[in-house]
């Protein structure tokens, strides 16, 4: 459990820096996602081949279906989120995106028969209060309903992604991440192809950030993420998942110079405090 927990946290920190790296690329959000998923899936395919692992997903059609739905949802969520970055800012969009775990938490007793404990519910209330504090001073969302809707839709797609990936029982780890990311690439490719017939023009200065976003943040990040969430409780994934938007907010302040008000700082404390409390209580209760 500890190894998977560490991998999950590292993945969240990488994902938290996505908005910062993407802000350096002078392309439309959907094209950034297309290039990101292409580079990331290509890396995972190469690693899978070099590791000489056997292909197993063809034996489990139900798992293939669940991973495909999860991958399509991930591609859609990223395209929606990246557009929201532009309209309402990286920090605010990231926090709204992470309403997704709340949806997952509420559905977990029905979909996965996981017990919804009082501590988990209490921790979520603390986390949600933190989000309210952070959004209370966000000037970017005022008068920009479109950006808010995009971020909200990305949260719904996030929930779909986690739920269907959790349903994959046999296909795990690198193979799972490889398929998931490749389907995300296909989703972005179909969208971009239907939207425009133009060849993507990339400035020479953008290549470094595209490769970082695709190979490190996406390829490595997705491997760490999808190789760990299958072994973690859904409610743990949901609660600790708020470390990603927290890191995104902090990076947006220090790197992009987005405004951090006292209410934002208080909100960040609530978010981190709620996540840490839930995990400390779980470890004490289980003795792990």
What do the predicted segments below correspond to?
Residues 5, 93-99, 164-185, 218-254:
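Helix-helix packing/entry segments at the starts of transmembrane helices
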Residues 25, 32, 84, 96, ...:
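Hydrophobic/aromatic residues within transmembrane alpha-helices
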Residues 61, 65, 97, 113-133, ...:
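Loop-to-transmembrane alpha-helix entry segments
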Residues 31, 38-42, 82-113, 154, ...:
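Specific alpha-helical transmembrane segments that line the substrate/conduction pathway
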Residues 44, 48, 116-136, 154-155, ...:
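Hydrophobic transmembrane alpha-helices of multi-pass small-molecule transport proteins
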Residues 1-34, 72, 76, 80, ...:
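Glycine-/small-residue-enriched transmembrane alpha-helix faces in small-molecule transporters
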Residues 1-13, 41-69, 82, 110, ...:
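Membrane-interface interhelical linkers
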Residues 16, 20, 45, 71, ...:
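Hydrophobic/small/kink-forming positions within alpha-helical transmembrane segments
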């Amino acid at each position: 459990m500890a190894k998977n927990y560490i991998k999950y946290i590292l993945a969240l920190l990488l994902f938290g820096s996505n908005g910062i790296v993407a802000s350096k690329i002078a392309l439309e959000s959907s094209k950034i996602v297309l290039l990101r998923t292409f580079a990331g899936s290509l890396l995972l395919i190469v690693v899978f081949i070099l590791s000489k692992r056997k292909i197993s997903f063809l034996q489990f059609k139900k798992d293939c279906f669940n991973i495909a739905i999860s991958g399509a949802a991930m591609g859609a969520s990223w395209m929606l989120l990246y557009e929201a970055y532009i309209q309402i800012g990286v920090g605010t969009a990231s926090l709204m995106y992470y309403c997704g775990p709340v949806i997952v938490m509420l559905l977990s007793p029905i979909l996965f028969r996981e017990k919804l404990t009082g501590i988990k519910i209490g921790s979520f209330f603390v986390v949600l209060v933190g989000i309210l504090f952070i959004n209370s001073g966000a000037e970017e969302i005022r008068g920009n309903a479109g950006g808010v809707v995009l971020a909200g839709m990305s949260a719904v797609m996030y929930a779909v992604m986690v739920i269907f990936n959790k349903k994959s029982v046999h296909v795990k780890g690198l193979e799972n991440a490889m398929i998931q990311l490749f389907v995300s690439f296909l989703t972005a490719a179909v969208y971009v192809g239907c939207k425009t017939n133009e060849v993507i023009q990339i400035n020479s200065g953008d290549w470094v950030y595209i490769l970082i976003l695709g190979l490190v943040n996406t390829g490595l990040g997705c491997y760490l993420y999808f190789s760990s969430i299958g072994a973690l409780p859904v409610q743990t994934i949901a609660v600790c998942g708020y470390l990603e938007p927290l890191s995104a907010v902090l990076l947006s302040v220090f790197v992009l110079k987005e405004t951090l008000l006292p209410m934002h700082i208080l909100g960040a404390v609530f978010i981190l405090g709620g996540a840490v409390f839930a995990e400390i209580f779980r470890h004490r209760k289980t003795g792990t």
